[in-house]
């Protein structure tokens, strides 16, 4: 079998999305900045995509800025936002995506900000009392906390954090790369100034994403060289990427409840079968709690054995693709910074299984059967 269970890293392109992109890859090739018909055709497609995305997120089209993906979007919001608003204090956590934590660490090293890390409980959820204390202490700070953790799946209460930030005059940015396309976001209700998305996390193309920037909190241009993207990001737009992103998000919203039901059942099936088949298996963070974590992610630690060091390799040899952590750092030798923050000093190995609408129950069963065989435990 050939089983893909690494959908938090990237998802396969939906064929319907590819069909939407094809005309803009082959026929509609004009530069959107050109005033002739070739340019106007693609410019219209870009602006239609922006309008559709804004409608799905309940914001205005001018608040959607296209980028190359989540990492660029997070960097732009942090670097340009801090500069634009003269922010000196940033509140974040130790388990953010590297696009956020590395950027903030560099800004702190450069003396541009003071970085304050909010406390976490043993499951990896933020300590809201500590967050409140930090907000009271550093009024006017920026808060950067991800909606859904890409490794353990923990969900942040965006409403609660947004209300706290509003109360203390804080700028709230959330990395929502893992949740856009899987959960609805109503930006008229959420008290959030900036958020990010990447199309390849919801069956769209790679190399395209967007950021939402609240119209009352516009940031300075972060890429010079052109007036594209409301004069915030210069450079010729990725037209067929934007068309693909729009099609993927429309498809995700149209089928969201059905996909959630299907994927949640797959995750529950894997949890039940692992507990039944492998004594000593544990779940990291709150990834086994369907209500408190992404329904697409399950982070698992297995009993200590010689098999742990070769587990991902052995799964790969059996045709199963999974991850030991964030795909953006899977080649690193330092292990998962998320698990290191939650379980300091622990030697536990971990595997992240992440699911999509294309996975099937028999793939879960096959995977658990192989894992059971690895650990020489009879079903």
Where do the PLM segments sit?
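Pyridoxal 5′-phosphate
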Residues: 1-379
